Amino acid sequence: MAATCSLLASFLLCFALLSAVSFAADPFVSYDFRVSYLTASPLGVPQQVIAVNGQFPGPLLNATTNYNVVVNVFNHLDEPLLLTWPGIQMRRNSWQDGVLGTNCPIPPRWNFTYQFQVKDQIGSFFYSPSLNFQRASGGFGPIVINNRDIIPIPFPQPDGELIFIIGDWYTQDHKALRRALDSGKELGMPDGVLINGKGPYKYNSSVPDGIDYLTFHVEPGKTYRIRVHNVGISTSLNFRIQNHSLLLVETEGHYTSQANFTDFDVHVGQSYSFLVTMDQDATSDYYIVASARFVNETVWQRVTGVAILHYSNSKGPVSGPLPVPKTDVSSPWSAMSQPKTIRQNTSASGARPNPQGSFHYGQINITNTYILRSLPPTIINGALRATLNGISFVNPSTPVRLADRNKVKGAYKLDFPDRPFNRPLRLDRSMINATYKGFIQVVFQNNDTKIQSFHVDGYSFFVVGMDFGIWSEDKKGSYNNWDAISRSTIEVYPGGWTAVLISLDNVGVWNIRVENLDRWYLGEETYMRITNPEEDGKTEMDPPDNVLYCGALKNLQKEQHHSAATSILNGHLKLMLLMVLLASVFRFC
């Protein structure tokens, strides 16, 4: 009996220790996100916004390199919901990406738990809804991934941090805006710009009385890290703080060569970090401004967000006109001067100890080139649609990898053209069949009339070139093959192109889309399907235990009667029960 007990106890102890090691390898952070409607008046007009945990914008998701993140999302809306995490690479785990090509929507009154690791990442990002134009009503919030203690940041530790979530805003909610697009109308000029969910300070008589604005309190002489995210619908915004320099240090997970700017253009879907030193006198407060860019700024004057920077020893309120952007965009060529100065800090360590410049991307042979051309929206099959390479994407009813795993035929096509052709525009479920371990060049050619931001899920890419005109092979001679910035969202100017290089080392299905919400809603997107023909469980995770089913697989979905548990949380519970059982065995023996 004693020998049996000893053997059983030894087995259970070994199993428990192995389980503990597997769970303790990297820490966990857990969040509950309750997504619901909230009545607010950010521009003085009562309207329905989308809040997370009663907050608009939503709460900060704060993690550190390699942490496991668990986000339990409760959908209290009256329509399906998905949250996506632009820039978070979801290594081997496109099941958590939160777009229709990878996930079934969370039905109303249901919840779903996202579970992912921020593997080898640092930096500034945000989360937002990906369905039904919901981002136009909110549901967004910031993400910060901190360096591990053993990896130094390439600048002195700031005295504090400030987060700015900026974006254009309409006083109509997302459903009304969606109906306008569905009826074939363009949205027109926004009603304003919000800074952290608040309207503009009354800097002149054009701003209505009674609008709630933000004041940021700072200490003189201190240096703050300023994280700026443009979560808006379609408007590029110029960000500036009156009389203060912006020292650019990071964008979307990579440290930049440090450069000072008086003002900075932040395009839709982009995130940046700056260091700002409070080195001005305190005779008065200072304006913080986010204003529409690359438009007729006189006509678009109302599309301006204004907050206040308040020194603790300030002697009075700010007054007078707003500071104007000093960065010249009067000609197309000058408009590109700022983004071309954004380069990688090749000597800094990012998420790993090795310098960011140790990956010599400029010496790798390109295996495939994809030229993705956008056009102005047009009518296809009686509806207003937007296209890439003449195809307006229609999301499959069954997510791609679920269809693959369950042998669903005809869910999508792998025939997306690698360049634009002179063919009739069409609706289709056409996707890129990309090669695992390939090294591809993607050229975004913007033949639309507006500046656009393009994003690739699951990856960062090297921004090697941009120019006006039509891209051709000889343009590669002008590429930056040494210190191009690596990021996940890049602007493309109307009548111009931007070229990026991507190393395809992340198996899964990954969305390529325009971040301008109106164009995205109208179909300007596609997906890359990347599979490993020698898959052995090491390059792609299995579907999570709580996967949702829809489309051709909807009969597999069970009714949800309680909180959707995650495998991690279940694992912790099982480990706890195992330890209790082990204690009982020792006591019995």
Curated annotation (Swiss-Prot):
It comes from the Eukaryota. Glycans are attached at residues 62, 111, 204, 243, 260, 296, 345, 365, 433, 447. Gene3D superfamilies: Cupredoxins - blue copper proteins. Residues 328-349 have a biased composition (Polar residues). Cu cation binds at residue 455. Keywords: Cell membrane, Copper, Glycoprotein, GPI-anchor, Lipoprotein, Membrane, Metal-binding, Signal. This is Monocopper oxidase-like protein SKS1. The gene is SKS1.
